[in-house]
UniProtKB/Swiss-Prot annotation:
This is Vacuolar protein sorting-associated protein 35A. Belongs to the VPS35 family. Plays a role in vesicular protein sorting. Component of the membrane-associated retromer complex which is essential in endosome-to-Golgi retrograde transport. Also involved in the efficient sorting of seed storage proteins. Binds alone to endosomal membranes and is required for recruitment of VPS26 and VPS29 to membrane. The VPS29-VPS26-VPS35 subcomplex may be involved in recycling of specific cargos from endosome to the plasma membrane. The modification N-acetylmethionine is found at residue 1. InterPro entries: Vps35, Vps35_C. It is found in: Cytoplasm; Endosome membrane; Prevacuolar compartment membrane; Golgi apparatus, trans-Golgi network membrane. It holds the Pfam family Vps35. The keyword Transport applies. One of its GO terms (cellular component) is endosome membrane. The keyword Protein biosynthesis does not apply. GO terms for biological process: protein transport; retrograde transport, endosome to Golgi.
Amino acid sequence: MIADGSEDEEKWLAAGAAAFKQNAFYMQRAIDSNNLKDALKYSAQMLSELRTSKLSPHKYYDLYMRAFDELRKLEIFFMEETRRGCSVIELYELVQHAGNILPRLYLLCTAGSVYIKTKEAPAKEILKDLVEMCRGIQHPLRGLFLRSYLAQISRDKLPDIGSEYEGDADTVIDAVEFVLLNFTEMNKLWVRMQHQGPAREKERREKERGELRDLVGKNLHVLSQLEGVDLDMYRDTVLPRVLEQIVNCRDEIAQYYLIDCIIQVFPDEYHLQTLDVLLGACPQLQASVDIMTVLSRLMERLSNYAALNAEVLPYFLQVEAFSKLNNAIGKVIEAQEDMPILSAVTLYSSLLKFTLHVHPDRLDYADQVLGSCVKQLSGKGKIDDTRATKELVSLLSAPLEKYNDVVTALKLTNYPLVVEYLDTETKRIMATVIVRSIMKNNTLITTAEKVEALFELIKGIINDLDEPQGLEVDEDDFQEEQNSVALLIHMLYNDDPEEMFKIVNVLKKHFLTGGPKRLKFTIPPLVVSTLKLIRRLPVEGDNPFGKEASVTATKIFQFLNQIIEALPNVPSPDLAFRLYLQCAEAADKCDEEPIAYEFFTQAYILYEEEISDSKAQVTALQLIIGTLQRMQVFGVENRDTLTHKATGYAAKLLKKPDQCRAVYACSHLFWLEDRETIQDGERVLLCLKRALKIANSAQQVANTARGSTGSVTLFIEILNKYLYFYEKGVPQITVESVESLIKLIKNEESMPSDPSAESFFATTLEFMEFQKQKEGAIGERYQAIKV
């Protein structure tokens, strides 16, 4: 038994090493004296120290390496003895007289190495004898190291193709047979280690077994290095024999390590040509074997092989690599009923990555993988294993990363079915990944059908999903997600107006049912996208769709009205107000007066009912005046109604300065230089006079409230409006009215005033002087004004 106490073990190792060193010394002295008899005597005593059962594998290895070094010296001595006339056959028989079996076999292997070198007997006969004789040691630890020594000293003496030991009687088949037999016996010893000692020490024994695995695996490495082991021999002899031993040993540690060894040490070409044999063994392994890692590594190796050697790609199709891997994974999962969901998902993730690398043009293969994954996930509900969820995201991201094109992923019918197994938070993450892929690669989604499929995938960020109790989305994250959706809208495009209208209708359906908090982010870009569509419509009489065209400006404006109506309820009345005015301008360009009037009406209703903040009212009124000034579609009646309303709003603003500025801004609604029908000088003058009256009232309020005359800035602003209309030739704006206003301002300026107003007035006077210097009508008009 191996001792528990590390201190005792150190003492035993020290004692063994001391005895070993002493006998090694006497052995070397005998070698130096060419005394074969004493050399054998002391070497046997030295090797007897390897008979101990008190050392752990780690400590035993220390002792073994000392023996290995001394045996190399002994082997050289044996070789010299044969040159001096000693018969190698007699030497081979002489070493077998050692009293204990373990030293005897070490010496026999050493003498056998010399025997093979002399070529006095076929190598295969000696190797067969040695590998059979080693059966005499059945203690797992001692037997493993003995056979490891045999493998080490024989590896350069195998009758391989091109080897000096190859001959008529010695072929690579003999070399393979020897290595396979030694491998089989070593694996049996290694597996038996698990049964040595009490059950409570099982964990320690498994750790120690892990430390010894390379002793067994080196045999497979030797096989992979033999020149004579070509594909045929590997397929017909090596692989079946190795797999038979792996399956029959029924030990999870051995099975996992050795299957992995096969994958790592033999060429990729061999794996490709023997896939069915290798994969056929996988379902026969113990259920506890980590077959997920093994198969993932196999697929990774094959993927890299295909990536580095384009000429081998036809062979993947020829051997039906994908089908074999897909079937094998299904059988493994079926055989291991308790396989964790993580392992199953990882297997399909690896298979999908393999498929995308090796068969990027076979979307049907990729879809099959996703379908198989769905089959395994069915009935399991949402995945709550964090690592499994992460692996599922990796699986779903693979097609996006490979093709850099979401459109290709949309062709995979099973893709959205896999997405359904993600939890709410992960759906949100996956949706963001998809949107970023579209933006990064500038991918255009060009049909309503594809947009529908896309939105099914990214509903994690466009719909209020059934979120777990207590799950709150960070506001910054939410805004970032919605901004990405807003950008996405501009990637949904088709030159055909009919198809584009179908696309925006799909967007409308999803956005209006996606929850109110998202609308302020998604409706504006949808409106912009729809307005772009209007600009692309053919002019009347040039419609390629004829009278029956399904997309008309009227239909689109009705559509816009429906989506903007949702905004005041969010509430986002300011946003809806702006969008109504934008739509009114678009209707103006389409010469749709009733529609434009309706949009203005909706904007006015929002102004009256929803916009109550004084600053917001000022901004809104500026937008109304600016938009109305640009409108050309309205007839006299409709325009009068709208301008009358606007001037009424201006006069009702809370603050006098705001009232004044809004009223004089309304003057522009009554004089448009390029439209003779809208040149009403009387109403222009009326607005300016009303503005002066309000400015005067504002100054009086300032005088009453603060004891000061207040700023004359408003008067100077009104003067600038007078000058503007005077320059435009409005008859009602006379020289006298301008001079009178200048005189008023000068009188006010005689009072204490603020420097900014003085500077403003001075700049205005300088402008007037500059205009006087101009030639023509402008100069003449300004020269008439006496300052």
